Amino acid sequence: MAHKKGVGSSRNGRDSNPKYLGVKIFGGQAIEAGNIIVRQRGTQFHPGTGVGLGRDHTLFALVDGKVEFSVKGAKKRRTVSIVSADA
């Protein structure tokens, strides 16, 4: 009979850092050029007028104005646009 207890190793004990994804500025809110609108993996939201697409699919404002979310096309794509504040 063994005098020492067999010691196993756990297969858990890992966790990834939070990525802080999601919509940062919602529809109708004012935004300045350069501000991030959506952080995402892939294009869940597509860029519309006045919105740029970053290398990691982040959507950001190219102009000042108000954020507007809409669903367009037969594929029902969710697009994000900037409507100028003076319009």
UniProtKB/Swiss-Prot annotation:
- Which protein family is named in the record? Belongs to the bacterial ribosomal protein bL27 family.
> In the record, what terms sit under GO molecular function?
structural constituent of ribosome
Q: GO CC terms on record?
A: cytosolic large ribosomal subunit
The protein's superkingdom reads Bacteria
- Which biological process terms from the Gene Ontology are attached to this UniProt entry? translation
Sorted alphabetically, the keyword list is: Ribonucleoprotein, Ribosomal protein
Q: What is this protein called?
A: Large ribosomal subunit protein bL27
Q: Supply the Pfam families for this chain.
A: Ribosomal_L27 (PF01016)
Q: What NCBIfam families does UniProt report for this protein, alphabetically? A: L27
